[in-house]
Each structure stands twice: as structure tokens, then as C-alpha cells.
Regions:
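Mixed-charge (Asp/Glu-Lys/Arg
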Residues: 1-17, 23-145
Length: 145
């Protein structure tokens, strides 16, 4: 939470279905309907392969998050480094076998949460939101024509 922009609102869902935090984005003191889901992971030590941190994820959690219409940020905190790494769900390689229970996801080691450019995240959330709204508005326009 210490790395979040000051004005953002973080809420914890009452039931954990794969959403650990919901973040509402504040820009220039205004909330404009932009939000994202955060899935939190952690470990005592790192698990590095090819300069990427890795962590198991349940396929059911991946599917739940993938079917969600909001942007998903996955964060892994490593206790002995006192550092967290992040990736967007869109950048996670889907499970090779959808029938398996777990699969491995990777976090680029350069994606340190302490160094994240939140403007890049805001811009991506805005792109996704604008596409969804444009699609909905186009469908509504067709239905009312």
C-alpha cells in the first residue's frame, strides 16, 4: 500500500475470489470511474528463472480474473528482499493445459513495485475502459436506431 498514489482508494473485497484489492484511480483530485483489481502473492524468498520471478497461480483464479472486465495487476512481494514485483494479467502467458490445477506465472525483475510508473498503468486502464465504453455505446446506438 505504501507505493500507491496518495489519492487512490484501496478497498478489500469481503470475499476473496481472486481479488485482493480494488483500486479506484484518482486523477488531479477527481475520480472518473477508472479502477483495477490487484491480486497479491508473496513468498519468503525469491524464485528466479531467466531474470524473472515466478509464482504458481491456480488456473481457476486465472480464469476468474481473465473473465473480469477490469484491468488486473498481479503483485508478488518477496520478504527477504523487501521488494514486490508486478505484471499485468494481459502479459501472463495463459496455461498450456486449461485442465491443469496450477501453472507458473512470471514477473519481470525490472518491474519493481517501488519503481512503478503509475501513469503507464492509468493510461492502460483508460484505454481498456474507453474500448469497453465505445463498444457499449455502439451497441446501445444500434439498439435505439
Amino acid at each position: 500500500m505504501q507505493h500507491l498514489p496518495r489519492d487512490w482508494t484501496a478497498t478489500t473485497p469481503k470475499k476473496d475470489y481472486g481479488q485482493d484489492l480494488n483500486l479506484e484511480i484518482c486523477e488531479e483530485g477527481q475520480y472518473r470511474g477508472l479502477d483495477l483489481i490487484v491480486q497479491l502473492k508473496s513468498s519468503a524468498t525469491g524464485d528466479i528463472l531467466n531474470n524473472r520471478e515466478r509464482h504458481p497461480l491456480k488456473v481457476s483464479t486465472y480464469n476468474y480474473l481473465w473473465d473480469n472486465l477490469r484491468v488486473v495487476l498481479i503483485v508478488k512481494y518477496i520478504e527477504d528482499e523487501n521488494e514486490a514485483y508486478w505484471t499485468l494479467l494481459k502479459d501472463v502467458e495463459p496455461p498450456a493445459n486449461p485442465e491443469q490445477e496450477n501453472f507458473t506465472i512470471y514477473f519481470p525483475r525490472q518491474n519493481k513495485l517501488s519503481e512503478i510508473n503509475w501513469n503507464d498503468i492509468i493510461n492502460y486502464v483508460r484505454q481498456v475502459t474507453d474500448k469497453k465504453l465505445a463498444s457499449t455505446r455502439a451497441k446501445n446506438k444500434q439498439n435505439h436506431s
